[in-house]
């Protein structure tokens, strides 16, 4: 027993989890009669996310996690999606730097790890939970509407609520079990994120409306750009 514990302590912690699960090259998922073009930053993305974006009328270009800001801007997307993925968000500073440069230039939607990465890009901090959130029955409250959603979760890190103060971020959702941050928004930048998995299948379907919100943000941003010329 003691020998096993010692071996566990001596095992080095890997910091390349996202690198190991992200796609190695760009690929495409097209849909009939597309209305929007989305770049999805793959940090370990589930295929059901791609299906839901396609179903919402989006052509999706899936890119490796370390795709540069310049490459993404060259694709001229209507929106950028930042996916779920494993590990500590601070282990992928290249994604954080890219998101910092994209702030205010394109609507963005992040889930799970993508949520944490957007938080860091806007100046908030993250920390490791004593007990990670796992399973498909986590109650989350939408602060603006008061609605309670049952959500699917699988993460070990969370956004520090105190660190949000003084940033452009607003907390939009909280976990009713431990009051941790479950959602963030920057309305003036058409950016929002959630800690849980709205695409979960099988799993609760309470939060699939978030994909519609992403579509609405892209449409609103497009209209705003057209107005200002």
Model-derived regions: residue spans:
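RNA-binding accessory domains that recognize and position tRNA/RNA substrates
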Residues: 1-70, 74-76, 89, 201, ...
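Active-site-proximal beta-strand elements of phosphoester/diester hydrolases
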Residues: 37-42, 151, 192-196
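A glycine-centered loop/beta-turn motif at secondary-structure junctions
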Residues: 183-226
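Hydrophobic residues at beta-strand termini and immediately following loops
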Residues: 41, 63, 129, 174, ...
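Cysteine-nucleophile active-site neighborhood
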Residues: 74, 78-79, 83-161, 203-218
